[in-house]
């Protein structure tokens, strides 16, 4: 795919963007197969492909330049500020809104934060889009709350022009470092969450809750996990590192008992809301550490099936040992880091790998998602 940013050397994030998509996926699939060399896999399923452009639902923009001429984007390798409002990973409506937000910052007269001088107010603009509704969550990451009055002054005009913006907040990040967000979130709209819908499952996104950045591929990931889980007809499921509940809520129904564990409390609030909306009554979502949760559970109340979707660091030996001890009929492991996945698979004992499938969640990069089915021997 042609990208002017990449060709100019301004943004090199999509390091494989000049390769045809088919070749990108082929390289990733081969990398995955090579990692599993020497490990028995019953069935390799065909990779799930992504759209080439317009697939990304989240923009994280550094605010650069000056109050009279702000730039939303990044600093290129030469140290120059570059606007990324026309990045082709974003849908067209998102690109339009990003351009408007550059004007918004200018009209509000908010000085961009300078890390080198520890001066300024506006650090980042974070924009998230719901694919199902086209609505947006807009967050301003500020050094202090001093600029909020300026944002509120210009906000009515912005919301009139873009009624799709349903949630606006200011995140206060006072530390003089390039840290993405702080602890304090101030809502500037009545709405405090963004609704998404994948495969007719309502999912909610709060400012600090994690959500996949490629919703079309995420929908296929959840749907395929649902199909794999259905084969086992489980009565009781654990969904560890459950986030906003994407996997568990796709796999549960009114007859299945589901326990979802996630350390981020905002994500748990979203998962509970989704379960309520679906009418599920045998669901328990809790804001806990997944490893500590598993260690504290009784073997008399063990699940038939466990779903895990850990961060890049993986599960770790302690949690893998717990999974082996509970010995569910099956484990569905979704990973964004195949290297930590391989380490974890060495620690999980008593299982055979029956299915592996790659999902091109992050096109034009070296990264991908992989779904693995482990069945009890």
Curated annotation (Swiss-Prot):
SUPFAM superfamilies: S-adenosyl-L-methionine-dependent methyltransferases (SSF53335). GO terms for biological process: rRNA base methylation. The active site is at residue 336. InterPro entries: 23SrRNA_MeTrfase_RlmC, MeTrfase_TrmA_AS, MeTrfase_TrmA_CS, SAM-dependent_MTases_sf, U5_MeTrfase_fam. Keywords: 4Fe-4S, Iron, Iron-sulfur, Metal-binding, Methyltransferase, rRNA processing, S-adenosyl-L-methionine, Transferase. It comes from the Bacteria. Pfam families: tRNA_U5-meth_tr. Its EC number is 2.1.1.189. It catalyses: uridine(747) in 23S rRNA + S-adenosyl-L-methionine = 5-methyluridine(747) in 23S rRNA + S-adenosyl-L-homocysteine + H(+). S-adenosyl-L-methionine binds at residues 212, 241, 262, 309. It is an enzyme of class 2 (transferase). [4Fe-4S] cluster binds at residues 3, 11, 14, 87. One of its GO terms (molecular function) is rRNA (uridine-C5-)-methyltransferase activity. Belongs to the class I-like SAM-binding methyltransferase superfamily. RNA M5U methyltransferase family. RlmC subfamily. Catalyzes the formation of 5-methyl-uridine at position 747 (m5U747) in 23S rRNA. HAMAP family: 23SrRNA_methyltr_RlmC. This is 23S rRNA (uracil(747)-C(5))-methyltransferase RlmC. It comes from Shewanella frigidimarina (strain NCIMB 400).
